Amino acid sequence: ALKGYTNYLLLGTDARDNSLEAINKTGEGNTDAIIIASLNNDTKEVKLVSVYRDTLLMVPASGGFNDTYRKATEAFFYSGVEATISMINLNLDLNITDYVMVNFEALIRIVDAVGGVDLEITEQELYWLNEYLRDTGLNTGRTYETVPSAGMVHLDGIQATAYCRIRYADGTLDYGRAERQRKIISLIFEKAKKMNLNQLTNAINGVLDNVVTSVPVAEIIGMIPSVFDFSLADQTGFPFEKFGSMKKVPEINIADPVFAMTLESNVSELHKYLFGVDGYEPTSRIKDISAYLQALYDKNYYPGNIYQ
């Protein structure tokens, strides 16, 4: 993207294996969190943008697969991180090269390293948090304590990880889950800024073996002091304008997709949101992808195929 910005792709995988090799292996799990972290190097502001996991996008050819239209979360299944980055760059007109990927175990350790997080949860979130706690405990082989009540709560690592997985509470589905993920990242960031350099360095060292990243360890350690200079300015989800009530798209064998309305206009909006560019014109490739997706939408928009 533009000069003066550094963009990272943050990925959370639902891979059930805690080993790094398994996380980075093609076909091991989906990426249930896809978040662009954009750092403005001049103003020291950070913006977070979740790409909704069910968004229909073009996954460019890689690893023996041809170009294919899939949900964003599924790109990882085709060729791991590389396919996910290629998809984001192609469809959103970005040039991200660096990524950080975590699994459940890594997120648990990160939250515990900053001393847990405090936030408000609803009654429905409480119910689902405790449901997901059981599953997260099984996946990671960790013990846990259920969260006793709604309202203002203190969550430890495994509880916060379960919170990030909730998608059925309060009728918000994946949009709500993406928002919860960004909320936890924001809280981790704020807690990290309150630590001293030594504490923060120790915390990061403690999670590195559960993180897959393109950034060399020495560079990560070197970047730690600058954490204190940055602030979280804003966060949102992509696509901004969307339609997520279609049951199926038989042409590409997809159920319950999210359509960007349209991809082209959403990409223009994204570049305004992240980089302050007015009237951004997406590439001709994005316009073609956008037109194809719009045609799929038009063809499959009929009463029996729409959730009421």
Regions found by a protein language model. Give the residues of each.
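Non-catalytic, solvent-exposed segments at the cell envelope interface
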Residues: 1-308
